[in-house]
């Protein structure tokens, strides 16, 4: 296995020995892991811990809306489990609803069919206050919930989730918005339902109880002709025989955090991607998988039978350095896919020899080591691919040299420096030369924004590629590719003028002509948070700030953004598209999944999962 690190200092060796001894002890041997208060703590530590617990307790810190949301979450979770099992009765409903509760039908009697093809049917409905009269009692609510779930066959694969997305504390009761999701087998295939309910609760009860529930919207997607889902989990059939999968990839990050030292780059807040390309020219796509520090990156070659072979070591690409992203692209126009890696050591370039191995051709080192995303583009139309590199946090060197401002969550401008590396071909010693032309071409404007992703596209149809950059804390950037008076490439930052600043936690970018009007549209992956949606609407949230800044924070938690390209008029955000709910959208991609000629959207989302569901 390859690593750029030189010999570890003696002090780290000693620390490693101590760590091995420590981690070999059982959990009950550890004073930090044993039940009860920690044995090794000072009075001040215990006092600080108690104060922190009080601040985290919404009831003690004055956040009554969050205290209510926490109290209502438990009965809602139980109700969701009962809905999944089916046949709700008055007894189950009485645990969460008042005896005199008011309810309406949660499933529309005549839903609107908005799509039908040989594979899927989509039904949708919105509800009006005048649609029907309220019905009284828990029996009516039980009947409404049973009717809602009537098309889903109850079984072990049935899933139901209920989450509170807004809370308003009123004297007459607590008003909430509840997001509803359910899925399972139907009569012909698989069914997925989503919806939104408006609920009023009794505030003074020890256990919150619903006094009224009214539907706001409902949608149902049903697959036809087959009991199989659209996507099948083929992990075991493809990777199951691989030792790399059994001993490495089958374990989550939480497993390795307790086994590999931080000094190797094993951290919670690392993000690792992958690259797909035909490495050996056999017409089959292969996969390069980036890994956290201390774990070898993996190259899997696809076999004719659909399985993969791990050739990482033989190919010379099993680097141990923390690697955030990779590209498989032809950099020297020889018809073979070369490898580019974004590592903590810098951007590593390896050329494909054509015999199943890779050789090092360049290592581009920056002051900033928090390198995130890579993209390849021929920005200057000279016939070879150049590289664009995004960076999240700035190094101490950059901060001192540039005198960067302090961190500002909603509009951070203290991040690392993104780089455009021009491909200048081979040098005298055989290495490939990549020249930093960031400032030269105008890409150093708004270039300290904690960038996580970037994507190139000719959005203005003028024949050259423009650049959109998604930034983690605040406004994103759109750089239009143009020419200066001398005819040289010069980018202009035009996000505000084009209407695509999109304040948020930008994590991913994808372009496609989703409405088939001849212009490329933009989809930006951000963060959706139910807790954030509740908190940012409360009067207690940032009470001394301006309304515009509060609105910015509310936007941060709304989810993803779809922008329609209206040509000379710029872009317009399409709020009614239904594409906002992507959760924590680390990656988003336009793709025509069903080959109907219309672009669909795939979103990879989530966060670290541990055995403790409360441990985020």
Set out the residue ranges of the language-model regions.
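N-terminal secretory signal peptides that target proteins for export/translocation
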Residues: 1-2
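Acidic, glycine/proline-rich Ca2+-coordinating loop motifs
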Residues: 5-8, 14-17, 21-616
């Amino acid at each position: 296995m390859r690593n750029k690190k030189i010999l570890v200092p003696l002090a780290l060796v000693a620390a490693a020995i101590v760590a091995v001894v420590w981690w070999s002890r059982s959990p009950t041997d550890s004073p930090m892991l044993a039940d009860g208060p920690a044995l090794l703590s000072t009075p001040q530590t215990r006092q600080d811990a108690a104060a922190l617990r009080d601040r985290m307790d919404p009831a003690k810190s004055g956040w009554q809306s969050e205290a209510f949301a926490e109290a209502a979450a438990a009965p809602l979770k139980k109700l969701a489990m009962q809905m999944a099992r089916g046949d709700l009765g008055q007894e189950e409903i009485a645990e969460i609803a008042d005896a005199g509760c008011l309810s309406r039908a949660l499933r529309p009697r005549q839903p609107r069919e908005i799509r039908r093809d040989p594979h899927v049917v989509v039904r949708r409905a919105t509800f009006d206050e005048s649609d029907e009269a309220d019905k009284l009692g828990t029996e009516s609510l039980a009947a409404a919930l049973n009717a809602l779930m009537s098309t889903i066959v109850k079984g072990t694969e049935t899933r139901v989730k209920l989450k509170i997305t807004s809370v308003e504390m009123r004297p007459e009761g607590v008003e909430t918005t509840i997001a509803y999701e359910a899925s399972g087998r139907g009569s012909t295939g698989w069914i997925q339902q989503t919806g939104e309910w408006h609920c009023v609760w009794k505030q003074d009860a020890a256990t919150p109880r619903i006094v009224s529930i009214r539907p706001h919207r409902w949608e149902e997607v049903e697959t036809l002709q087959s009991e199989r889902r659209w996507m099948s989990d083929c992990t075991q059939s493809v990777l199951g025989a691989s030792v790399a999968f059994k001993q490495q990839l089958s374990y989550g990050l939480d497993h390795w955090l307790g086994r590999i030292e931080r000094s190797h780059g094993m951290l919670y807040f690392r993000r690792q991607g992958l690259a797909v390309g035909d490495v050996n020219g056999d017409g089959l796509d292969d996969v390069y998988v980036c890994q956290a520090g201390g774990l070898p990156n993996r190259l899997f070659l696809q076999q004719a039978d659909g399985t993969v072979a791990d050739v990482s070591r033989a190919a010379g690409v099993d680097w141990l350095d923390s690697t955030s992203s990779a590209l498989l692209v032809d950099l020297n126009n020889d018809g073979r896919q070369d490898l580019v890696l974004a590592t903590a050591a810098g951007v590593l370039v390896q050329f494909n020899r054509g015999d199943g191995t890779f050789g090092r051709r360049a290592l581009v080192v920056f002051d900033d080591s928090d390198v995130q995303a890579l993209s390849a583009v021929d920005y200057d139309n000279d016939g070879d691919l150049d590289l664009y590199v995004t960076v999240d946090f700035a190094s101490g060197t950059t901060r001192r040299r540039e005198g960067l401002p302090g961190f500002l969550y909603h509009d951070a401008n203290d991040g690392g420096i993104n780089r455009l590396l021009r491909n200048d071909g081979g040098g005298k010693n055989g290495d490939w030369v990549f020249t930093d032309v960031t400032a030269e071409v105008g890409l150093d404007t708004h270039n300290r924004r904690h960038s996580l992703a970037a994507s190139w596209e000719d959005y203005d149809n003028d024949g050259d590629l423009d650049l959109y950059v998604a930034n983690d804390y605040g406004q994103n950037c759109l750089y239009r590719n143009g020419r200066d008076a001398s005819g040289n490439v010069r980018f202009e930052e035009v996000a505000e003028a084009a209407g695509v600043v999109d304040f948020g936690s930008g994590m991913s970018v994808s372009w496609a002509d989703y409405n088939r009007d001849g212009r490329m549209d933009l989809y930006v992956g951000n963060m959706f948070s139910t807790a954030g949606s509740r908190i940012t609407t409360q009067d207690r949230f940032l009470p001394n700030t301006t309304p515009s800044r509060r609105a910015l924070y509310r936007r941060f938690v709304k989810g993803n953004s779809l922008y329609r390209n209206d040509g000379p008029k710029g872009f317009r955000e399409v709020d009614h598209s239904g594409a906002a709910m992507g959760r924590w959208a680390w990656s988003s991609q336009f793709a025509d999944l069903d080959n109907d000629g219309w672009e669909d959207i795939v979103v990879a989302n989530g966060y670290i999962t541990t055995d403790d569901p409360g441990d985020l």
